[in-house]
């Protein structure tokens, strides 16, 4: 369907319309710019016997893992996030993990669903990006039409049960003046990662080469810009790789669950 390739038309979709399009396979890959104003979420799905430990892990690491919804065991719905929402079909890209290894990427995980699986929806930076755009701040990955670059750092998350590993951050290049404004704007959204965790000096958090992100795509950094880093909801994928649960499902980086909630609901000021 042609309208789904047009950025302006993609932005005009409601959250429900976006989910239905993903369910039909009409939207694949990055959901950046999709359903303007609607909250998007990272996804982590784990067996019930690991759910309590993962919830504790998220509570101990609220910057990279801000939980905005949890399903009941075996339930493919998270009612507080949307009507007619199906965790197993409504994401534009999934990753399947076994014993810490990503073994498959697919567009539907309905045939893998089990009665013991619990889904966690985790706040996504696309919510604060909308506020940045409204304030006139540039988003280089959007300008370039690529996924935001994401990096594994040497900053450890606080462990819980079997879950431990490094924080993942997303990066957006900004001038120093823009970075100050970005801190002010994103601080209003603590439920979707909030303010940056690091500015400049990528090597200080273990990032050796900005041109080689661990997830997403590289972007240009101009001579008058600094890299600004936010905690990222891809962190659970790094933790799953380190913790090696027997089975897990996540979203593919950049491919989010679009909800019926509005970004404005998550602003604190």
UniProtKB/Swiss-Prot annotation:
The UniProt keyword set, sorted, is: Lyase
Q: Which domain of life is it from?
A: Bacteria
- Has UniProt tagged this entry with the keyword Lyase? yes
Q: Please name the GO terms that the record assigns under molecular function.
A: lyase activity
The reply to whether Lyase figures as a keyword in the UniProt entry is yes
Pfam families, per database record:
D-Glu_cyclase
Q: Which top EC class is named for this enzyme in its record? A: lyase
For this protein, the record's PANTHER family field holds: D-GLUTAMATE CYCLASE, MITOCHONDRIAL
Protein family per UniProt? Belongs to the D-glutamate cyclase family.
Name it.
Answer: Putative hydro-lyase M446_2125
Which species is this record about? Answer: Methylobacterium sp. (strain 4-46)
